[in-house]
């Protein structure tokens, strides 16, 4: 899901009102844990979706999840995991369509939901990824189990850069969206050493934003970085009941269920 593999983040000079003041917007995302380690942990994920101490230098990479509590279908306030739900974001001739498919895939012993992302520029396909998610029936936290990626050039697949799966080559699942996002929460979204190590920090929980699809309040703003690319920094913005509003310069133009 991360677009870091294509280019360095571009600063998007769009003012965004947050509960911390006025900021600028940009983008990024993801994380992982072996099935053998999907056991009980100390603190409930509902309280920020994390366990373990949080300091300025640490990012949570262990999550208190029981295997039986994970499902392939559900609805987090900021992340809809229901078949047929689609988000379409655009910026000029750039387009991103995110669709929750009817398909599921077992990854690291867990049945996950397949979410397809199709990125295009000028009508030409740039990337198609099949992302694998599961949601906790207990906390509504959504976990990320990996992705299969096809990178296109001139209509042909040229590589699969960025692909990873939890349980393969030391990769572990990560947290894509806490059931109850708390200001300042820091966690890994992807844990695939050397391939994908995206991490997130919640920097605002009460923003407002206007996009082509409408005006939204209680907007969640997440800053994403990766230790694999020092200095890279992007932002994603989410609205309750809808999901992703903005990613870099891409802004939501349409959302809803498709048949």
Question: How should each PLM-predicted stretch be described?
Answer:
Residues 5, 33-36, 254:
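Intrinsically disordered, low-complexity cationic segments
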Residues 11:
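Cationic, low-complexity basic patches in intrinsically disordered or flexible, solvent-exposed regions
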Residues 21-23, 48-52:
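Residue-identity detector for glycine
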Residues 27-40:
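Bacterial N-terminal signal peptides that target proteins for export
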Residues 39-48:
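Bacterial N-terminal signal peptides
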Residues 54-259:
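Conserved functional acidic sites
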